[in-house]
Amino acid sequence: MSNLALVEICKGLIGTWKLVSYTSKPAGKDGPIEYPLGKDARGYIIYTADGYMSAQIMRPGSKPYSTMDPFAIADDEAADAARHYLAYTGPFEVIEHEGKVTVKHHANLALVPNWAGNHQLRFCELKGNELVLMPTQPWKLNGVLVNQCLIWRKA
């Protein structure tokens, strides 16, 4: 794939995308499609022209905190909220990986501490106003290796 083609794909990513679905399926075998943050998960991913991205995904319906002060919440409230939210941000680049168009997200900041300072590789398909992102490797979710798929629509 030419550098020019990768640049054009990068240009197509620029903007705000709203989550349509976030699914997972057991890797390497048949199994049910799961919805890690529920069928009604909500989220946005934003790509900027200067090469940065931000992704936010949540399960609706988290219990409200007992206070509006985010630094005074109880540990159990914080833990519950963290189980229903994924977020990271940093620079991004479009590359070729395993012969496929791939977006490399450099997670400078992340809700999951293990992600900060690392990168996330996502196979990337642009289909009109739809963006499909899939991690390049299976992930372990709740102890099971799964393949994930995130579908976004231009906001």
Task: For each feature predicted by the language model, list its residue ranges.
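Lipid interaction determinants
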Residues: 1-87, 94-155
